[in-house]
């Protein structure tokens, strides 16, 4: 029996013992996301008109920018988010981040590419970089969820991924617990770029949620 047949048998046994489930309702689903949850996700999509800076949904086209972006200077050109952070998305992301559901990240990435491939290709990023975790947090969790997203997006779009050059220099408080000004203060001097990094024109920065 050759290796391909052995691997297929292994995969069949694994799928029987641990069947793939929808990341949003945990029902067994071989297609990734079940039909019922796809309907819910369609309603949770961040739609146009979007803020021209951060990508959040805004009330009218004439507005152009959300309130936060009109009063805050950002160090990036444009942000994009796929879904609003509401149930079942927020519960699914929580499982992805804190309960070792790494497969969810692959499914999220596939959905992100479906929605934003043309936009990303228009940006022509030289590399993709995941937002890093502090080493102690990564050791505790076992993985960086943003890195899973970045690597899958890079694989699909054939864009190099650099997950080593951007580093977290100090531990920070969870952003979701902080107000706007506290978030800015929390992240100040929290990141650095290694001196070995060779500068490029465009970087696609990836994280699991926008705060």
Positions of the model-derived regions?
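Glycine-rich phosphate/pyrophosphate-handling loop used in enzymes and phosphotransfer proteins
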Residues: 1-211
């Amino acid at each position: 029996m050759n290796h391909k047949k052995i691997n297929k048998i292994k995969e069949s046994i694994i799928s029987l013992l641990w069947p793939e489930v929808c990341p949003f309702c945990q029902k067994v689903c071989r297609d990734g996301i079940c039909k019922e949850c796809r309907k819910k996700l369609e309603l949770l999509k961040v739609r146009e008109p979007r803020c021209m800076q951060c990508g959040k949904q805004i009330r009218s086209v004439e507005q152009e920018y959300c309130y936060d972006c009109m009063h805050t200077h950002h160090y990036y050109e444009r942000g994009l988010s796929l879904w609003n952070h509401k149930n079942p998305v927020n519960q699914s992301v929580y499982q992805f981040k804190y309960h070792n559901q790494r497969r969810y990240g692959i499914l999220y990435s596939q959905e992100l590419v479906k929605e934003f491939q043309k936009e990303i290709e228009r940006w022509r990023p030289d590399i993709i970089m995941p937002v890093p975790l502090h080493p102690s947090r990564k050791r505790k969790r076992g993985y960086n969820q943003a890195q899973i997203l970045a690597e899958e997006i890079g694989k699909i779009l054939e864009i190099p991924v650099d997950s080593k050059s951007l580093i977290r220099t100090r531990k920070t408080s969870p952003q979701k617990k902080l107000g706007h000004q506290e978030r800015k203060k929390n992240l100040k001097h929290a990141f650095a770029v290694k001196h070995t990094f060779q500068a490029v024109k465009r970087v696609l920065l990836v994280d699991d949620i926008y705060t």
